[in-house]
């Protein structure tokens, strides 16, 4: 089995259909995308004991305490830790991924993400906050990073004629994982309890991601799509005549400009995600029955996830025609205008306008994620794009805290 994980064992033959690779990437990204749905766990994790901690119990004491409940602010740190370790893992293991191949990285991601959720289950059983952070945060975060970058360079090499479409397909599932995971998690919590849910979902994701990883193939050296002539395509914006090595990419101003672009885009998107649902409930409170406003707000949250998914494939594939630079110019100009308009729509209780504004912002949030790998390939070449993309994702780590 271990031999079948090696990169030289997954080189595709001439009869292989390149469209078999995107579904494999989708299985992995739909699994790790559940990190966006972790909000369903916070209420359950704050009432495991049934007794509130007194004001004299410090933050550090709550990390190990078993006699009273954690605060919501304690457990939500799990998400921030996971995003930080996503960026760190992507940066540290990106170069290893290029050598080891996507299948080995995908299996490692499955073990870390699935195993991390199982460790979290243990933390719930023992009521140890540090185990929650270690499981879903640190171990799971490493799985997120490995899983996130595992298909990127592979799909770019399979689709050199449509790099934007390729990265959109690779990253699309991450935005939609919560749409599947949240209803499943909610059902399992009601049926089994939150601790058991973490274990069951960890096992499900471990199996699903492993199956996805075994669907990965890499093209043979020199392969290109039938009928595609790279010489005829005058879109070469590379800063060098050859592929830029990962150890040199971060020494260029282009890398840091793209790093800043990603950080700003993600910070803005997280800023909207963090307030959109409660803000919607506030502005819509006078227009809907209080008994159904919660359900409507949940539906609004699902719409945001859908916009995130659509934006990843729409903007990334559109960038193949618009150009990467123009696409990001649209993100910044239109995004800034809409970001400033959202509070205005909320204050004046323009519900439909507020919903439309936030949905468009979320499409650009997802599109920014999905288009950046293709932009990197345009500038630095495809040979080390996975490793370079991994290092660029440290911007996500910072944005996860700032946003």
Predicted features, each with a name:
Residues 41-88, 289-299:
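Extracellular/periplasmic helix-loop-helix junction of adjacent transmembrane segments
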Residues 77-97, 302-315:
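Central cavity-lining transmembrane alpha-helices of secondary-active solute carriers
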Residues 36-45, 166, 247-317, 373, ...:
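Extracytoplasmic gate region of multi-pass secondary transporters
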Residues 45, 144-159, 166-167, 366-380:
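Intracellular juxtamembrane helix-capping segments at the cytosolic ends
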Residues 174-223:
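Helix-loop-helix hairpin linking two adjacent transmembrane segments in secondary transporters
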Residues 111-125, 333-347:
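C-terminal ends and interior cores of transmembrane alpha-helices
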Residues 30, 116, 129-146, 263, ...:
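Hydrophobic core of transmembrane alpha-helices in multi-pass small-molecule transporters
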Residues 169, 178, 365-366, 377-403:
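A late C-terminal transmembrane helix in Major Facilitator Superfamily
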């Amino acid at each position: 089995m271990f031999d079948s994980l090696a990169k030289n064992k997954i080189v595709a033959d001439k009869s292989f259909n390149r469209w078999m690779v995107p579904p494999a990437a989708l299985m992995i990204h739909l699994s790790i995308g559940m990190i966006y749905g972790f909000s369903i766990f916070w209420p359950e994790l704050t009432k495991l004991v049934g007794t509130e901690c007194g004001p004299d119990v410090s933050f550090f004491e709550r990390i190990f305490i078993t006699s009273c409940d954690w605060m919501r602010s304690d457990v939500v740190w799990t998400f921030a830790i996971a995003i930080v370790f996503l960026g760190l893992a992507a940066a540290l293991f990106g170069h290893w991924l290029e050598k080891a191949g996507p299948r080995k990285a995908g299996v490692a991601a499955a073990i870390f993400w699935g195993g991390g959720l199982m460790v979290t289950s243990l933390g719930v059983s023992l009521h140890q906050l540090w185990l929650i952070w270690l499981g879903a945060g640190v171990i799971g975060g490493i799985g997120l990073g490995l899983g996130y970058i595992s298909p990127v360079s592979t799909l770019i090499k399979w689709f050199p004629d449509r790099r934007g479409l390729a990265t959109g397909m690779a990253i699309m599932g991450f935005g939609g994982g919560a749409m599947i995971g949240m209803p499943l998690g909610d059902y399992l919590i009601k049926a089994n309890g939150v601790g058991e849910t973490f274990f069951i979902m960890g096992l499900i994701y471990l199996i699903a991601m492993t199956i996805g990883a075994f669907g990965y193939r890499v093209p043979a050296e020199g392969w290109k799509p039938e009928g595609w002539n790279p010489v005829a395509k005058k879109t070469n914006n590379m800063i060098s005549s050859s592929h830029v090595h990962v150890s040199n990419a971060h020494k260029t101003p282009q890398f840091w400009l793209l790093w800043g672009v990603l950080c700003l885009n993600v910070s803005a998107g997280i800023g909207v995600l963090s307030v959109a649902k409660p803000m919607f409930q506030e502005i819509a409170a006078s227009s809907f029955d209080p008994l159904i406003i919660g359900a409507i707000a949940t539906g609004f949250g699902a719409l945001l996830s859908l916009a995130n998914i659509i934006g990843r494939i729409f903007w990334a594939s559109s960038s193949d025609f618009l150009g990467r630079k123009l696409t990001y110019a649209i993100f910044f100009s239109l995004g800034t205008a809409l970001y400033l308009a959202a509070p205005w729509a909320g204050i004046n209780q323009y519900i439909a306008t507020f919903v439309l504004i936030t949905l468009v912002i979320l499409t650009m949030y997802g599109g920014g994620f999905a288009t950046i790998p293709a932009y990197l390939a345009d500038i630095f070449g495809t040979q080390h794009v996975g490793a370079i993309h991994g290092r660029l994702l440290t911007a996500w780590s910072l944005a996860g805290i700032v946003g």
